[in-house]
């Protein structure tokens, strides 16, 4: 019986060896081996631990790297003289209180093991007086070090170092949601960053004599560096514009889909989630009602408001429901219009003044027109027209994930005829019951990534590359799927018809004329949006999408600020400042006061 088992074992090992790579310099277990001999298949780790790859921005500035770090661990008992400890480390009393508050998960956590990260100068002080402080434990170990305080949702964390955060998150109901959605690039590309150790797979007999390998050896490989699409300077600048406010800002290069800036507000330092001495700050993030740990641009889908009029106009042009010269009365018996303006005699004027009644009638033309084949059945016509509208709108990458490299991307939502049949409890719903779609309200939900990508599609006249955060892996390029061009179902000529109206938005009389960059020679094309909040106490949400330069776009931006009021006064200024910063490298003097006022409000969180 044992002989039969040995024969079976040798045959299996021979088969595995035969499947090994032909360039592997190993010997196999031949069938001529003595079947009475028992062999042991081993897996032996080769010397060397792979270095984790670095994260670099688009200009090759290092954002995250693995470096030595010094930790000072305090004994839980007896309590130390904190003022004396502060003198030892060169800290004043305010710094001592702040560092202890940051290191403890909650006030009064006296027995919590406190650790402090130290600078080289502080380490020298501790070593010099170590005899007087025998209970202090100083250690050195390699850790991920962030060279920037910006980009938390982009950079994310290495889960091995984020265990304290993950442990704190498990103890809160909201934290269980956060811990799956904040890994960023460190989590998404972990396998490439980590590299892998080398392993040999020797086959030995009972006396330990080698008999080749039982499978292919694994080669040692260092972790690969990731070259991000992010512009670190632009990212830091954009975060100052949002600060403590709830919302997001996403900036893309429409020509490539590369994400230039990705802000989720309120902003926080990425090192907070992994630093051993910031348990208190992590607790504040987890418990905050403003939900700073929510990755808003990717995981939160909201009604887009009036910026969605651009999509509805493009679909209506494609399907022949309107033409560029189509005009409608500003009939406020249909829907209110918050802007006083001339009669929208064509699409350009309708976009310039964001006339709600104009786009109510555009969408009505789309939904209520009855094809000849359905002339006697308006119910069927509405169902067919809504389904057709949805098919064209979905080609913008909506109602589905874009396939970006941000963890847990949400798909957003577009209603179907079946959805309304169920919601209205009848198939005989009318356009009047779904007209909110015409102004980007109601059941439509888009993510920030989708909003920015929508602007990029219009900038490109109908095509896009999926938005992504990594432009190069090691010495290579991005993941192959980010090089695949996607096209909408809208002809390019119809996107060109939107451009005059989008330019007019930022010209005299337009809804965002104050945000014009004409003084520095930059023509911006954009669209403002004010999203109804639905609550009685809070302000509406502010939105803006646009791109610049209008005729040769190099940057597309989407901004969404919760409870900030009008898109023209809150969102548009942030967007154009980011455009100007990226295209010129500086802000014109006439907008410096404007910039300071926005940043001041951002620091105060409103």
Where are these regions (language model features)?
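Periplasmic/cell-envelope proteins involved in peptidoglycan metabolism and beta-lactam response
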Residues: 2-15, 19-279, 301, 324, ...
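Beta-lactam-recognizing serine transpeptidase/beta-lactamase-like catalytic domain environment
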Residues: 64, 204-215, 255-307, 311-564, ...
């Amino acid at each position: 019986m044992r002989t039969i088992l040995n024969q079976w074992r040798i045959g299996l090992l021979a088969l595995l060896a035969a499947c090994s790579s032909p360039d592997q310099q190993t010997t196999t277990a031949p069938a001529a081996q003595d079947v009475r001999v028992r062999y042991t298949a081993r897996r032996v780790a080769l010397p060397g631990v792979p270095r984790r790859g670095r994260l670099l921005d688009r200009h090759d500035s290092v954002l995250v790297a693995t470096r030595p770090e010094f930790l000072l661990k305090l004994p839980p008992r007896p309590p130390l003289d904190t003022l004396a400890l502060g003198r030892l480390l060169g800290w004043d009393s305010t710094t001592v209180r702040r560092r202890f508050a940051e290191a403890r998960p909650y006030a009064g956590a006296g027995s919590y093991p406190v650790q402090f990260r130290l600078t080289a100068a502080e380490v020298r002080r501790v070593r010099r007086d170590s005899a007087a402080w025998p209970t202090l434990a100083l250690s050195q170990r390699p850790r991920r070090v962030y060279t920037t305080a910006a980009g938390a949702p982009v950079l994310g964390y290495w889960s091995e170092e984020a265990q304290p955060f993950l442990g704190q998150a498990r103890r809160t109901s909201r934290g269980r949601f956060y811990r799956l959605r904040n890994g960023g690039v460190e989590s998404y590309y972990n396998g490439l960053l980590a590299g892998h150790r080398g392993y040999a797979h020797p086959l030995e007999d009972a006396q330990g004599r080698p008999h080749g390998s039982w499978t292919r050896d694994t080669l040692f490989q260092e972790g690969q560096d990731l070259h991000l699409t992010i512009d670190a300077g632009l990212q830091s600048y954009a975060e100052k514009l949002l600060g403590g406010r709830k919302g997001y800002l996403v900036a893309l290069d429409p020509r490539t889909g590369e994400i230039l800036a990705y802000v989720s507000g309120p902003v926080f330092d990425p090192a907070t989630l992994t630093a051993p001495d910031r348990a208190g700050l992590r607790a504040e993030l987890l418990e905050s009602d403003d939900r700073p740990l929510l990755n808003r641009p990717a995981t939160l889908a909201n009604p887009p408001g009036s910026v969605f009029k651009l999509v509805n106009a493009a679909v209506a042009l494609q399907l022949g429901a309107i033409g560029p010269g189509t005009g409608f009365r500003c009939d406020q018996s249909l829907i209110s219009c918050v802007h006083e303006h001339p009669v929208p005699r064509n699409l350009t004027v309708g976009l310039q003044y964001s006339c709600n009644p104009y786009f109510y009638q555009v969408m009505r033309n789309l939904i209520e027109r009855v094809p000849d084949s359905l002339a006697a059945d308006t119910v069927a016509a509405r169902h067919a027209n809504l389904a057709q509208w949805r098919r064209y709108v979905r080609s913008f990458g909506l109602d589905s994930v874009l396939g970006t490299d941000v963890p847990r991307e949400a798909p957003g939502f577009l209603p179907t005829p079946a959805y309304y049949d169920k919601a209205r409890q009848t198939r005989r719903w009318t356009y009047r019951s779904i007209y909110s779609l015409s102004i980007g309200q109601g059941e439509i939900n888009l993510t920030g990534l989708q909003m920015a990508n929508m602007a990029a599609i219009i900038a490109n006249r109908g095509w896009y590359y999926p938005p992504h955060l990594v432009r190069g892996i090691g010495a290579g390029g991005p993941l192959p799927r980010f090089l695949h061009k996607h096209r909408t179902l809208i002809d390019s000529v119809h996107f060109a018809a939107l451009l005059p109206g989008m330019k007019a938005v930022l010209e005299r009389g337009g809804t965002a004329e104050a945000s014009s960059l004409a003084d520095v020679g930059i023509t911006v094309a954009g669209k403002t949006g004010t999203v109804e909040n639905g609550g009685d106490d809070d302000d509406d949400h502010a939105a803006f999408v646009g791109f610049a330069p209008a005729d040769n776009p190099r940057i597309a931006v989407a901004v969404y600020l919760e409870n900030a009021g009008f898109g023209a006064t809150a969102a548009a200024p942030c967007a154009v400042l980011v455009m100007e910063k990226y295209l010129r490298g500086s802000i014109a003097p006439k907008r410096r006061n404007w910039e300071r006022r926005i940043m001041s409000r951002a620091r105060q969180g409103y």
